[in-house]
């Protein structure tokens, strides 16, 4: 509900602040006093189109602040739009002389569109030139379903519709992408089979690179051993030693040559031992020569696979896992396509059964609502008005396949047409009041504003309007701009607007009236500028004093 409204430099207003109450709040004032300025200020703040010249003459800016109470629906809206809820809701609009408007929710800058979305959660407006939201097609459907307690049926239908559409969408995607899905399955099947067979481990590339470097160093040692063996296996070495030994043997046991003979024998033995050791080393290198070749082949293969799939070698394992997962998903999509088709048929059948059931209920409820509204309209001096609810079939939606149109005629002999096209502002407001009275505690917004709902009525009819407004105010805050004392007399809060003509400017002031001031204002509304004893007495009676 509206908690307070503050306005500065707005049209004819210098500065004012109003605090609102629960229940019925009426706004009165002489014709031309500027009652519509308050409504303009509210619409300006909440992002709706208003007069272009809203900044008071001589000022650089205009600003309107409104404080609202909160409910869970509004809190959820704020959270969904990343605005931190506070104890109260603070909205603001600032317009500077250059024409730019800035909107704020809880001191956070927001767009005009978001402010307008928020407004739909805060209040309804019904008046001469404004009927916000209630005459939209979806709202008329909500009125009918709320009146007939059909919202649970509609929710079940909506759930079925969403499931049906999701299944259709999934089927369409599979059909559209059938070829590409099959191609991707082929690709992933080959890739996963290849990678599984290779079984490349994390860190394997680095280990193989280090091993290759080590083996390449050993390869150099192998070549050295081969070169040495080639040298010491030279036959001339053995021949030379044998010749030397034979020459010494001819000398007999000559002590002078014994040491030389021993050295030659040792040289021969050492040479044989070196040959054996070199042969053993050579034999041990045969395996490692093979291992180097195998290592290089494995390393080359890993690098080639990494380039092929454009994935780092260490990430090939993760790539394999993801590919297997995606392959499973795609195979399931193909396998489930027939199942989805059967499911789609069942959901479609269920939807039309539920929609048909809901349509039948709506037709019954529509007749009851028409009758209820006719009775209300009689009380509001619109006995000859016609109200009809036309229901036609349309394409399936989450809310059913019914096209619901509220139609009316306010003139005898005139065919009923869409309600917002045939009714005047005052008549339309009374239609809305009749609807609200019929619905009463259903579809209640935190606040409802009626702008001059009582145009063209008086006396008993005005009293009936006041009674219904009072009843409605027991479940929501009702703000009424009125000329009728019968309506104003039922207020919980009475606000008076006055326009004062000064020497150089015109000012508008706003005041919440006490009981004595209310009696005087009601008397003025009854008799005009000249307040009489009779009008004061009548005002006293309206206030039940």
Curated annotation (Swiss-Prot):
Gene3D superfamilies: P-loop containing nucleotide triphosphate hydrolases. GO terms for molecular function: ATP binding. CDD domains: ABC_RecN. Keywords: ATP-binding, DNA damage, DNA repair, Nucleotide-binding. ATP binds at residues 29-36. GO terms for cellular component: bacterial nucleoid. InterPro entries: DNA_recomb/repair_RecN, P-loop_NTPase, RecF/RecN/SMC_N. One of its GO terms (biological process) is DNA repair. Belongs to the RecN family. May be involved in recombinational repair of damaged DNA. PANTHER family: DNA REPAIR PROTEIN RECN. This is DNA repair protein RecN. It comes from Rickettsia conorii (strain ATCC VR-613 / Malish 7).
């Amino acid at each position: 509900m509206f908690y307070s409204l503050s306005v500065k430099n707005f049209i004819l207003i210098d500065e004012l602040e109003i605090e609102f109450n629960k229940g019925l709040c009426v706004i009165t004032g002489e014709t031309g006093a500027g009652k519509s300025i308050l409504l303009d200020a509210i619409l300006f703040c909440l992002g709706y189109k208003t007069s272009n010249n809203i900044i008071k003459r001589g000022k650089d800016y205009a600003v309107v602040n409104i404080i609202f109470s909160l409910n869970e629906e509004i809190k959820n809206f704020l959270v969904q739009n990343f605005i931190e809820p506070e104890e109260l809701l603070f909205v603001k609009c600032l317009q500077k002389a250059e024409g730019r408007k800035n909107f704020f929710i809880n001191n956070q800058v927001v767009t005009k569109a978001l402010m307008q979305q928020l407004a739909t959660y805060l209040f309804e407006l019904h008046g001469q030139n404004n009927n916000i939201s209630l005459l939209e097609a979806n709202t008329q459907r909500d009125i009918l379903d709320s009146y007939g307690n059909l919202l649970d049926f509609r929710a079940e239908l909506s759930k079925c519709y969403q499931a049906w559409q999701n299944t259709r969408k999934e089927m369409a995607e599979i059909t559209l992408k059938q070829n590409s899905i099959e191609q991707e399955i082929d690709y992933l099947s080959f890739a996963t089979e290849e990678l599984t067979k290779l079984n490349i481990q994390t860190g394997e590339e680095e280990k193989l690179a280090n091993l290759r470097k080590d083996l390449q160093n050993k390869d150099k040692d192998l070549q050295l051993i081969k070169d040495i063996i080639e040298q010491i296996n030279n036959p001339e070495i053995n021949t030379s030693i044998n010749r030397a030994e034979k020459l010494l043997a001819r000398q007999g046991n000559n002590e002078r040559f014994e040491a030389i003979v021993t050295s030659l024998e040792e040289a021969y033995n050492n040479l044989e031992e070196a040959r054996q050791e070199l042969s053993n080393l050579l034999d041990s290198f045969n395996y490692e020569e093979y291992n180097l070749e195998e290592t290089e082949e494995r390393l080359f293969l890993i690098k080639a696979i990494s380039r092929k799939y454009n994935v780092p070698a260490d990430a090939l394992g993760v790539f394999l896992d993801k590919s297997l997962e995606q392959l499973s998903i795609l195979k399931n999509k193909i396998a489930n396509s027939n199942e989805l088709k059967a499911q789609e048929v069942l959901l479609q059948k269920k939807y039309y059964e539920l929609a048909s059931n809901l349509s039948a209920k709506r037709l019954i409820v529509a007749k009851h609502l028409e009758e209820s509204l006719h009775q209300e309209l009689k009380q509001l001096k619109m006995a000859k008005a016609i109200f009809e609810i036309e229901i036609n079939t349309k394409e399936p939606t989450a809310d059913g396949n019914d096209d619901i149109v509220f139609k009316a005629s306010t003139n005898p002999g005139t065919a009923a047409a869409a309600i917002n096209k045939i009714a005047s502002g005052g008549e339309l407001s009374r239609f809305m009041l009749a609807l609200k009275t019929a619905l009463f505690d259903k579809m209640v917004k935190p606040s409802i504003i009626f702008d001059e709902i009582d145009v063209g009525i008086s006396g008993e009819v005005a009293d009936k309007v006041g009674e219904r407004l009072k009843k409605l105010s027991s479940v929501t805050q009702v703000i009424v701009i009125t000329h009728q004392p019968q309506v104003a007399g039922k207020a919980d809060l009475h606000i008076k607007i006055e326009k004062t003509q000064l020497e150089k400017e015109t000012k508008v002031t706003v005041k919440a009236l006490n009981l004595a001031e209310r009696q005087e204002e009601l008397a003025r509304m009854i008799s005009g500028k000249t307040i009489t004893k009779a009008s004061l007495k009548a005002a006293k009676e309206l206030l039940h004093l």
